[in-house]
Amino acid sequence: LKLYNDSFRYLQTDHLDYYLLHSLGRGGLEAFDDRFVNNGMMSLLQADREKGKIRQLGLSFHGNQEQFDELLKLHDKYHWDFVQIQMNYFDWKHADGQRNVNAEYLYDQLDKREIPIVIMEPLQGGRLANPAESVANRLKERDPKASLASWAFRFVGSYPRILTVLSGMVYQEHLEDNLRTFKGFKYLTDEEKEFLGTEIAGIMASFPTINCNDCKYCMPCPYGVDIPGIFKHYNECVNEGEIVQSTGQENYRKLRRAYLVSYDRAITSVRQASHCIGCKQCLEHCPQSISIPRELRRIEAYVEKLKRNTL
């Protein structure tokens, strides 16, 4: 309740146009009840919406299909004014097995109920703005002048139920590129949507990357492991075709040395995967439901094999 009241004080306003319940889904209805129902918060939020103190009440979803369906069943009771979901042309049909729910399903279910949608991760943590060379080449063949990021933004922006698209911009160039994309917005054709959601996403799905979007919710690690940094380095090597498969591979020595040197440069030794003890503290914080300790063990095993020449 204090956090809720402080929001109005910090923002120096007597009302909020959009109030979002963050990160619902994980833990199911039991977690939702503990956070918002049993303490009376949902009753208060509904009452404040009636008074106009909150204009639109919604949620951001992080979970699997069963948890999503449970939350939508509450729509008749609470009337969600908007829902924030992760949606991009890769997750449209290729969401990983742990989250178990494609963005296509999330969108369709919300569209049926006429619930406006806010999009998070339209670039999947930057992955769609900097894909593997083979993917980038295919996109450039279609439109040499279009930025790689613009394809991803146009994909999510071309669906009619979308209320707004979030974009984590770091540099001035990002802002300028986004303005070019959304000013005089060009809707994708059905063929272009299929091209991105099936062909391009299919190529990307063939790369064994880790579905980390660099949100850093898993940090800090109590043992100092740079979890997002390790995953980012590994994914970049996968996308650039720099992962070694066996000692008999062409350019084995060159690729082996390149990975080990770049790993040490990207991640200091005291923060590398070998320092993970499997405490699992990070698991509950990951919105992508990545099995973080397992992936760190896999990377560490790969590094050790490279060092020992035992692939």
Where are these regions (language model features)?
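Structured C-terminal cap/extension of enzyme domains
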Residues: 79, 105-311
